[in-house]
Structures are given as C-alpha cells and as structure tokens.
Regions:
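Flexible, acidic/Gly-rich N-terminal and inter-domain linker regions that tether
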Residues: 1-46, 63
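Aromatic side chains
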Residues: 20-21, 69, 85, 113
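Residue-level recognition of conserved structural "scaffold" positions that shape functional pockets
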Residues: 25, 31, 55, 110-112
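Active-site donor-binding loop signature of nucleotide-sugar glycosyltransferases
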Residues: 25, 70, 155
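Short charge-dense sequence patches
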Residues: 30-37, 67-70, 120, 124-131
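Canonical Radical SAM [4Fe-4S] cluster-binding loop centered on the CxxxCxxC motif
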Residues: 36-83
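Radical SAM/AdoMet-radical enzyme domain recognition
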Residues: 82-104, 109-155
Length: 155
C-alpha cells in the first residue's frame, strides 16, 4: 500500500488490488468530508508512447469500419524512446500511482512494450492501457498479466 500525505488530505493506493482512496480535507487530524479539489501532482498520468499504428496504416481499421481519432491511417511518427519514458517515470515515481499508456496505436505493439511495463513496476507505478487486441498474442497476454493493472480491449 502506497500512501501519500498532501497538505490537507491523504491518498492511498494498493498496487496489487487497484483499491484507491482519498480522505476528505483534514482539519486538526479530523475528517471534514469536504472533497479536496486536486492533488499537487497527478496520481494517474496518461503517457502517449505510440507514434504510429500498424493496424491503421494497413487499412485494417478502416476495413473494419473503425474511424481512428488519432489519424492512424496517415500518422507515421516514431514511438516514444525507452530513455524518454524512463525519464518521465523517474520524475513522477514518488507521486504517481498509475499510468495509462496510449498514443497513436496499440501500446502492446510498441517495440519495447515489456521493458516499458517493467520500468513502471520497478518504480511502483501500475501500468494500464487500452488496445484494439488486433496484435495481441499469447505471449503479450502473459506479459500483460505479469505487469498490468488493467487492460481494456476496445474493438
């Protein structure tokens, strides 16, 4: 269980179960039941690790009737470098409980996917992501089971 004390409240996160809770504003150590507006640093961070989508570029999504809000048919940017991801995680590791991996393409298709998940877990941050599932393999599913908190398949 990770616990973080802010000026007026306390938040806790269990990385094994995903249970999260935050107290209301505390005055003289007593719960007021007033909601704190926000933490001083994001407890959940969205990180776009994908710069392109191989399924979108192949036309598979279009054939399936799926319109990509990330313009996956035409985008051809590089995926995030592992060094850049590692730096982001090192800068937020003391304050962030979870990350949502995303970008233009399925995060599980990133060339360093397992390493990215391991970097998160080594920093006690739980990685989560949404995928089309089009490139999911048994090996990738096993990696997700080992490292991820939640994986959503959006077809």
């Amino acid at each position: 269980m990770r616990t973080r004390k802010e000026k007026d409240f306390i938040s806790c996160f269990d990385s094994r179960t995903g249970v999260y809770y935050r107290t209301g504003i505390l005055v003289n150590g007593k719960e007021t039941e007033d909601d704190p507006f926000m933490a001083s640093f994001p407890e959940l961070l969205d990180i776009g690790i994908m710069g392109h989508c191989r399924h979108g570029q192949s036309g598979l999504c279009l054939q399936s009737g799926i319109q990509c809000y990330q313009n996956g048919l035409n985008r051809a940017d590089a995926n995030m470098r592992v060094e850049d991801f590692r730096r982001i995680i090192s800068e937020c590791r003391e304050n962030t409980y979870q990350v949502a991996l995303g970008g233009c393409g399925d995060p599980d298709q990133h060339e360093a996917f397992e390493e990215i998940l391991k970097i998160c877990r080594d920093a006690e941050i739980v990685p989560n992501f949404t995928t089309s599932g089009l490139g999911m393999t048994r090996e990738t599913a096993a990696i997700c089971k080992k490292y991820c908190g939640a994986v959503a398949v959006s077809w």
